[in-house]
């Protein structure tokens, strides 16, 4: 009996987590975790601020969402009118942390990461691109740094195959994943 191909959704997001090993061993359990089931759907989580021995945060939010791009074709899958891997999918994950402090020397007002994955056609790799990611209000020992993320690089090289080729060919922009200035 031949198994029917099916699309498996995967999307996970974590807010704040850590395992500090020195000078003391401290595990910070994941705060605000979202994980999609293999059927897709929506997972959201929020965490109100907490203070741990070495770090603290004011709030954390995560979201993982995955679905077929065409609702009618998704219904057709349930009636076995089409194969589940014949309908394009989009998976989006977001993690947003506000008011993050490490010891008393590093402070970040906003850390936001968003990734969007679009399923590839049969035999093609999935495209994964950043969208709306940011690091804002970063201060280290009182010195403010402005961080500019190199999203353009990851949008251009949005599959593992493209990224491997860029890294192997020594793309100059690959070495600059982010820039900071004070």
Predicted feature residues:
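Extended, solvent-exposed, non-transmembrane regions
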Residues: 1-182
